[in-house]
């Protein structure tokens, strides 16, 4: 697979909660088509990094770009509903009465989805329907 375009870029991102520094100088590049894992011990800032990228929280400093557009910086903040990002951290966040497609589509219900695109992505990820 050719990784030809940068989808997400985070540079020098920092986040603190009170006096507790959770992220310091966090950097990340995610290329189109790449499968990425973020590993670390409990409390190392993995969830915080993802929440910052999704827009659920604002970083204290640094820049986050999505498809070469600045979505979070000192001057810019694009709210989560405009970022076209969805996350499911653990299986307890899934609706047990919905299948894979319906669980994913639930978070996208406010956005226009091209016919067949969701099925295409599910197939690309080798998920069972």
Which functions belong to the PLM regions below?
Residues 98-105:
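Short coil-to-helix segment of the ABC ATPase nucleotide-binding domain corresponding to the Q-loop/switch region
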Residues 70-86, 110:
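ABC ATPase NBD coupling module
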Residues 63-65, 69:
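ATP-binding/catalytic-site motifs of ATP-hydrolyzing domains
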Residues 8, 23-25:
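Conserved structural motif at the start of ABC-family nucleotide-binding domains
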Residues 69-72, 113-129:
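Conserved ABC ATPase "signature" region
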Residues 39-41:
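The feature captures the beta-strand-to-loop junction immediately N-terminal to the Walker
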Residues 36-37, 87:
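Short beta-strand immediately N-terminal to the Walker A/P-loop
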């Amino acid at each position: 697979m050719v990784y030809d375009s940068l989808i997400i870029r985070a540079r020098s991102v920092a986040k603190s909660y009170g006096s507790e520094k959770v992220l310091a100088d966090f950097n990340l590049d995610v290329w189109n088509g790449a499968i990425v894992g973020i590993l670390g011990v409990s409390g190392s800032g993995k969830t915080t990094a993802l929440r910052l990228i999704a827009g659920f929280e604002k970083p204290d400093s640094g820049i986050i770009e999505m498809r070469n557009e600045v979505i979070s910086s000192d001057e810019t903040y694009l709210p989560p509903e405009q970022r076209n990002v969805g996350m499911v951290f653990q299986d307890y966040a899934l609706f047990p009465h919905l299948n894979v497609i319906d669980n994913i589509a639930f978070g996208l219900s406010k956005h226009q989805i091209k016919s067949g695109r969701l099925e295409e992505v599910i197939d690309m990820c080798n998920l069972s329907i």
